[in-house]
């Protein structure tokens, strides 16, 4: 997933 780019966005 793109947790590195936007961890808060996914969560």
Swiss-Prot record:
Domain of life, per lineage: Eukaryota
UniProt-recorded name of the protein: Unknown protein 1
Annotated source species: Capsicum annuum var. annuum (Red pepper)
């Amino acid at each position: 997933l793109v947790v590195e780019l936007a961890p808060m966005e996914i969560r």
